[in-house]
Amino acid sequence: MVLRLSFMGTPDFSVPILQALLDAGHDIAAVYSQPPRPAGRRGLKLIPSPVQNLAKAKSIPVFTPQTLKTAEQQTKFTELAVDVAIVVAYGLLLPKTILETPRFGCFNAHASLLPRWRGAAPIQRAIMAGDKETGMTIMKMDEGLDTGPIALSCAIPITDNTTTNELAHKLSHIGADLMIEMLSALEKGQLKLTAQSGENITYASKIKKEETRIDWTKPAEFIHRYIRALSPFPGCWCNMNIAGREERVKILGSRLTTRPSLEIGRIEKGPDSLLIHCGQGCLEVTYLQRSGGKVLECATFLQGAHISAVF
């Protein structure tokens, strides 16, 4: 049995799964993605999503509606007559009509071990919380927020230095393998679904702007987790006194040290190192970015920046 699919996704994270479906020879009737976004200083140029770019390169019809709640969009989706909809970080709510249209339903690749970290930012929240593992889950979607029954999952460790960027890369490729495995089982009539546990339920809310500012009164381990979770985007930041001027600087890389903290916000500079005293322990800064500048290793950053204080 050859399944007719639609694919719904938007960012880079979704691309490996779409590519895997194409490489496996699946029939993809259409791709749905978020509308092109304004870019450039004046916002005059519209940039298609990474998923839209791949779909166009493969001559697959692409739809970019603002919503799927209208009768017009739901009719258009119904006319595709797909067996399965694959959803990966699409970014739009799927109403009940859409969920029930595909013959076998809609399946989502979610970057956590459900039911832990349901919601918008599962990778970041897992790192922020200090979780030692996370994973990828393929689930059949229902009307709830990531509450549907689980088809497959795979766990991977989170180390003390894992960043969101690194984890997203690994999980997207794991998700690609799981999605191919899931579709193979579905085609053979062998797919088994398991209801999610009612225990260990947590929610991964969107990252708020106020969470991105570093609070040096927190323990070094806490700050290190946030820097890793928010790197490279949106990035953690603090104010620095550089050559007598206050500047906002992003800290995009750090290392834990064994040094005890002597005074919150105290800085120790070496020829190529920057150590900042936190509420508990000290943090070594490894990558920084001034406003409008490039991401630099600490040694390079210090060559052009005389830092006298952080706050």
From Swiss-Prot:
Q: Any transmembrane segments, and where? A: none
Cystine links in this protein are none
An example GO CC term for this entry is: cytosol
Concerning InterPro entries, the annotation shows:
Fmt, Formyl_trans_C, Formyl_transf_N, Formyl_transf_N_sf, Formyl_transferase-like_C_sf, GART_AS, Met-tRNA-FMT_C, Met-tRNA-FMT_N
Entry keywords, A to Z: Protein biosynthesis, Transferase
CDD domains linked: FMT_core_Met-tRNA-FMT_N (cd08646), Met_tRNA_FMT_C (cd08704)
Q: Which domain of life is it from?
A: Bacteria
Gene3D superfamilies found in the cross-reference section: 3.40.50.12230
A molecular function (GO) term: methionyl-tRNA formyltransferase activity
Q: Which family does it belong to?
A: Belongs to the Fmt family.
What is the stated purpose of this protein?
A: Attaches a formyl group to the free amino group of methionyl-tRNA(fMet). The formyl group appears to play a dual role in the initiator identity of N-formylmethionyl-tRNA by promoting its recognition by IF2 and preventing the misappropriation of this tRNA by the elongation apparatus.
- Tell me what this protein is called: Methionyl-tRNA formyltransferase
**The organism of origin for this protein:** Bartonella henselae (strain ATCC 49882 / DSM 28221 / CCUG 30454 / Houston 1)
